[in-house]
């Protein structure tokens, strides 16, 4: 199987998006620097949705994503991000190259 590209939509606690983004940016840099299978981590903010953040991530394989999801860096990120997150959903996609 090829690269895995999850696309996530996150609703932050009302009024907390900027704080969420501050933490998310710092953690995303660490993911890319320390997780060999993490290839891309893009953060997007939709127009006219003040408390929404979207993510586009690319991992070398489903196993690389699982290593990220269950890894220490993700657990540390959740410590900062979970109190600011109201909900999250994601779609796992195969990257077509």
Positions of PLM-derived features:
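Short, well-ordered beta-strand segments in beta-rich or mixed alpha/beta enzyme
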Residues: 4-11, 40-69
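Localized chelating/binding microdomains
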Residues: 25, 55, 87
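Glycine-rich beta-strand-turn "strand-cap" elements at beta-sheet edges
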Residues: 2-4, 42-51, 76-97
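Short amphipathic alpha-helical segments
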Residues: 16-40, 73-80
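Short histidine/acidic/glycine/proline-rich micro-motifs that form metal-
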Residues: 11-14, 97
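Generic serine detector
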Residues: 28, 61, 87-89
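Generic helix-packing signal
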Residues: 10-12, 31-32, 72, 92
């Amino acid at each position: 199987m090829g690269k895995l590209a999850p696309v996530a939509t996150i609703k932050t606690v009302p009024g907390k998006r900027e704080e969420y983004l501050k933490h998310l940016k710092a953690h995303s840099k660490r993911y890319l620097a320390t997780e060999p299978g993490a290839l891309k981590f893009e953060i997007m903010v939709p127009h006219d949705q003040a408390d929404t953040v979207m993510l586009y991530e690319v991992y070398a394989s489903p196993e690389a994503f699982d290593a990220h999801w269950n890894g220490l860096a993700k657990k540390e990120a959740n410590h900062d991000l979970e109190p600011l997150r109201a909900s999250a959903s994601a779609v796992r996609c195969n990257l077509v190259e």
